[in-house]
Amino acid sequence: MEPIWELVEPWGLGLDDLQYFGEYTAKVKQHAIERLREQAENREQNLVLVTGMTPTPKGEGKTVTTVGLGQTLNHVGEEAMIAIREPSLGPVFGVKGGAAGGGRSQVLPMEDINLHFTGDLHALTSAHNLIAAMLDAKISQGDDLNIDINNVSWPRAIDMNDRALRETVVGLGGKTGGTPREDSFILTAASELMAVLCLASDIGDLKERVSRIIVAYDEDGDPVTVEDIEATGPATMLLRDAIKPNVVQTIEGTPALVHGGPFANIAHGTNSLVADKTAFGMGDYLVTEAGFGSDLGAEKFMDVVCRKGDMTPNAVVLVASVRALKYHGLNQWPVDYDEIGEAGVEAVEAGFSNLDKHARNLQKFGVPVVVSVNRFPDDTDEEVQAVLDHCREDLGVRAAESNVFSDGSEGGVDLAENVIEATEESNEEDFRMLYDDDDSIKEKIHTVATEIYGADDVKYTGGALDDIEQMNDLDFDDYPVVMSKTFHSLSDDASQKGAPEGWELEISEVYPSAGAGFLVALTADALTMPGLPARPAAADMDIDGDGNISGLF
């Protein structure tokens, strides 16, 4: 690795522009961010979004593709930056293990990034729990806000998968232990503060967004905000450094901004807007990713992030894999990787319905689509070629085999050339979002459910319709909607593979993320606090007497 100050100097960042965390990691200071935003006006600002088909639980290589494509664009003579989310400890120790790409397309220093990195997640956890503590102090010590303890919407947060904390009771310590009430924990990445951080333009905007977060409702049903409990200043203070984007490097020496990490199944699922705007001032291409399949991350990127950040994508890379196609073709739930390994090209072809639905969905936004077939070691030439032929001949979209995991930029030239062609042919006037701001909340939900997920209709259960009425009363009806849905299926039933038909999307709750500026519509299968599997990835991790880590990725 190259010292970070030397690596980024040709990209417009000097020694005084960085706040250092060792030799290979830094944050970009505010004055440099502002300068780069101005410089972006003289750059091409080609925005390339990487998304994917509905993945297996192990993932199909979106981050590998994002990193590999960024490296390859530089390899073929372009100037490209990379922006990705930073990992959460929960998934790192849970199912997926370490996350920052892999093989010859990874971001370094991998161990630091996956563990504590620059402390952004810790800062968010502290700020979130400070708000929770100040809220409970207000409730138990002279509540002049008349807070309804049965209508507190702000939980606690922890950056660890722990199902035992999904439902808790607090205040059981007697007279000095606070007011007893039901409570819960969420993963830090699921906190509204994470979404706020990633949508804020600067520290001033961050503070304003934090102030309007709704933490509870009073006995009259009116919202109680962070500002009402006087937590705006101290909470934002804890995030003073967290809003600065982190800059590191890929294994081939391309600068990468790794910042923020909201989940795409319960939030908007992309890295921070600050990172994106900074990257636009450093290169002519920005390659970024959206979480999970395109039904979740990409839809939210188009309808929420581009709306909030005034951005227009020039190309979308849809990551597919032989493994994921077999997963759908064999109609598996739960996944059986041994059966996938034994299946042949017939299973691949049987899974095309899922890939096709994702490709058609993306075309609705008016952005050129390039399918990237991320090749795994066990894939046969026949299987990969079947996917490429189907994309080119049946779907009529660009497609390329990607070997960036094994070969780095040498394995991504065909993909990069297709992406360059797509961006050159793109017309920003063709870009369109699925719905307008002034569409009703139910219209927005119905549009996403039918156009993207393939549902026939939407069914509202529990108090969801009352929630929508309340959102209208609070003048939140012009907010975009973030659909909180399982990532295991295009539908709201994780067991349904391919492109399910003849079903209704069930919405159980709608609530505001007033600081982030969107509404969240919950389906029946969405968890804000995941649990560890019977044998988590953590069980295979270790550290020796010299401090060398093994099993992290």
Curated annotation (Swiss-Prot):
Catalysed transformations (reactions): (6S)-5,6,7,8-tetrahydrofolate + formate + ATP = (6R)-10-formyltetrahydrofolate + ADP + phosphate
Q: Which GO terms describe its molecular function?
A: ATP binding; formate-tetrahydrofolate ligase activity
| Annotated metabolic or biological route of this protein | One-carbon metabolism; tetrahydrofolate interconversion
Database matches in InterPro entries? Formate_THF_ligase (IPR000559), Formate_THF_ligase_CS (IPR020628), P-loop_NTPase (IPR027417)
Specify the domain of life of the species encoding this protein. Answer: Archaea
Similarity remark? Belongs to the formate--tetrahydrofolate ligase family.
Instruction: Give the UniProt keywords, A-Z.
Output: ATP-binding, Ligase, Nucleotide-binding, One-carbon metabolism, Plasmid
One GO BP on record is:
tetrahydrofolate interconversion
Q: Where does ATP bind?
A: 56-63
Q: What is this protein called?
A: Formate--tetrahydrofolate ligase
- Species of the source: Haloarcula marismortui (strain ATCC 43049 / DSM 3752 / JCM 8966 / VKM B-1809) (Halobacterium marismortui)
Known SUPFAM superfamilies for this protein?
A: P-loop containing nucleoside triphosphate hydrolases (SSF52540)
Spell out the Gene3D superfamilies in the cross-references. Domain 2, N(10)-formyltetrahydrofolate synthetase, Formyltetrahydrofolate synthetase, domain 3, P-loop containing nucleotide triphosphate hydrolases
Give the EC number(s) listed in the UniProt record. 6.3.4.3
